[in-house]
């Protein structure tokens, strides 16, 4: 390994803010003229990102690459773990499915292979880039797992990277979690910690100052920054932990009520992110029939286990309520990927890809049937769709292990390079597609929202802001925010100094 200067961000626990701080540093380094790459050796997430060559990586690393202004590759996240069943996950290696494994088997059988994969990817990135922003996972102090971990201090050693430890003050007990983490680290690993960042701070910094002084005196580790909580950031969330903060209640101050079904194996829920930026929309994630209500737009998102999530909706009454909404109310229903499969007549699983159940009836709102297959499709796609009498060019990505066949009466939704994709009802109130990022297409999103507005007797809104522009602005806003509250120059100096010392 040679060229790149590395820095690694680890946290005291999951959702401490590692991904967002890493994203900020990708942007900061890139704007300072350094060719920068993100890296996460092993990511457990159901939010995916498809690279230009049709490979699947964690969504966070794809977004971090965008923040850095570089093209995402599988070397940036060579191992992706996608939970599919209880205690079982699909292991994705360099963007392609490797095999389904239970946690114990993965830990026992995959370790040496994983080490080789990670080392190879690190070698590629270290030789191609000037800066490498590495993200850990969970906590580096998981003493029951550390003998065979593949994502925290072992990666720091492989990359010879200094580590910044991040603590989340919003949860409380930040000093205890920081001190406890430091004390549980091996002596040599503790030497890699060049400082800590306290994240998600709310309140008066003067009240925190005595604690910062005590921490530095007690541990000898400098506090490199205290980052205030940043509202309405509009950068893709790493995992479903973020959904805990989403409202389930209707907001009467917003014109359009959007409900997203939050089934247990929800995936790629970032598909709805553009609606979070629309001033007239309120997005709710709902898990029960009682929470569903009568939304204007109902979205069935992706699922890592479509059959189990469909059974979940049938058992708790959501499926029946969807049928009643479709029959008696003017709701628009959109299913994406697994949600699209659920809208059909039936789903077959002849190979037991998801469950021992070989067939299940769907919601029967679209004339399609789906067969789950062993081979996964991962591809960037583009095509033409017709909606409200207009034609729209749309881009998206597909990640699915099923093939949906049209039945009598099917109307395709998108025409993609000579093939028909998706389905819609004659009145365009029910739509299904494999296209993730469908709503990221600004013109179509505007047409969909204006159709709903007209049906509610509201004037249409034209000239909505481009979501890509909003996200680019969000990267800059995040970078500026972190630069104001973190000692960037001190961190860079420590990065250089670290490479000159023996650890």
UniProtKB/Swiss-Prot annotation:
Pfam families: CbiA, GATase_3. Belongs to the CobB/CobQ family. CobQ subfamily. Signal peptide: none annotated. Residues 255-444 form the GATase cobBQ-type domain. The active site is at residues 337, 436. Pathway: Cofactor biosynthesis; adenosylcobalamin biosynthesis. Catalyzes amidations at positions B, D, E, and G on adenosylcobyrinic A,C-diamide. NH(2) groups are provided by glutamine, and one molecule of ATP is hydrogenolyzed for each amidation. PANTHER family: COBYRIC ACID SYNTHASE, DETHIOBIOTIN SYNTHETASE. GO terms for molecular function: ABC-type vitamin B12 transporter activity; catalytic activity. InterPro entries: Class_I_gatase-like (IPR029062), CobQ/CobB/MinD/ParA_Nub-bd_dom (IPR002586), CobQ_GATase1 (IPR033949), CobQ_N (IPR047045), CobQ_synth (IPR004459), GATase_3 (IPR011698), P-loop_NTPase (IPR027417). Keywords: Cobalamin biosynthesis, Glutamine amidotransferase. This is Cobyric acid synthase. GO terms for biological process: cobalamin biosynthetic process.
């Amino acid at each position: 390994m040679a060229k790149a200067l590395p820095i690694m961000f680890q946290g005291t626990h999951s959702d401490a803010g590692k991904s967002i701080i890493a994203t900020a540093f990708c942007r900061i380094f890139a704007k300072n003229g350094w060719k920068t790459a993100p890296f996460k050796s092993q990511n457990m997430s159901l939010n995916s990102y498809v690279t230009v060559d049709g490979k699947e990586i964690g969504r966070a690393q794809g977004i971090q690459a965008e923040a850095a202004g570089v093209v995402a590759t599988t070397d940036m996240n060579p191992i992706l773990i996608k939970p599919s069943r209880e205690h079982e996950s699909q292991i994705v290696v360099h963007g392609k499915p490797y095999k389904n494994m239970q946690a114990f088997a993965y830990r026992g059988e995959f370790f040496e292979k994983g080490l080789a994969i990670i080392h190879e990817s690190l070698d590629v990135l270290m030789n191609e880039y000037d800066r490498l922003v590495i993200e850990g996972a969970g906590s580096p102090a998981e003493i029951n797992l550390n003998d065979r971990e593949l994502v925290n201090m072992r990666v720091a050693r492989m990359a010879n990277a200094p580590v910044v430890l991040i603590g989340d003050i919003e949860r409380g007990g930040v000093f205890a979690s920081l001190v406890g983490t430091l004390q549980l680290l091996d002596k040599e690993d503790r030497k890699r910690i060049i400082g800590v960042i306290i994240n998600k701070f709310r309140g008066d910094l003067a009240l925190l100052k005595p604690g910062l002084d005590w921490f530095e005196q007690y541990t000898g580790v400098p506090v490199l920054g205290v980052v205030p909580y940043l509202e309405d950031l509009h950068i893709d969330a790493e995992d479903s932990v973020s959904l805990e903060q989403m409202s389930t209640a209707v907001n009467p101050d917003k014109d359009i009520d959007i409900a997203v079904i939050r089934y247990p194996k929800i995936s790629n829920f970032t598909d709805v992110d553009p609606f979070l930026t629309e001033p007239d929309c309120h997005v709710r994630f709902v898990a029960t029939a009682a929470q569903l209500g009568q939304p204007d737009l109902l979205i069935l998102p992706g699922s890592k286990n479509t059959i189990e999530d469909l059974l979940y909706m049938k058992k708790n009454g959501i499926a029946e309520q969807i049928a009643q909404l479709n029959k008696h109310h003017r709701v628009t229903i959109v299913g994406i990927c697994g949600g699209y499969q659920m809208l059909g007549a039936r789903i077959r699983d002849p190979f037991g890809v998801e469950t021992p159940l070989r067939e299940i009836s769907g919601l029967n709102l679209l004339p399609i049937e789906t067969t789950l297959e062993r081979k996964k499709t991962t591809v960037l796609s583009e095509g033409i769709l017709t909606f409200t009498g207009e034609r729209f060019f749309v881009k998206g990505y597909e990640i699915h292990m099923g093939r949906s066949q049209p039945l009598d009466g099917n109307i395709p939704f998108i025409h993609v390079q000579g093939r028909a994709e998706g389905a819609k009802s004659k009145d365009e109130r029910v739509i299904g597609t494999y296209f993730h990022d469908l709503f990221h297409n600004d013109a179509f999103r505007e047409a969909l929202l204006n159709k709903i507005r007209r049906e509610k007797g509201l004037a249409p809104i034209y000239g909505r802001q481009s979501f890509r522009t909003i996200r680019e602005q969000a990267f800059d806003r995040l970078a500026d925010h972190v630069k104001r509250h973190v000692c960037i120059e001190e961190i860079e100096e420590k990065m250089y100094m670290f490479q000159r010392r023996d650890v």
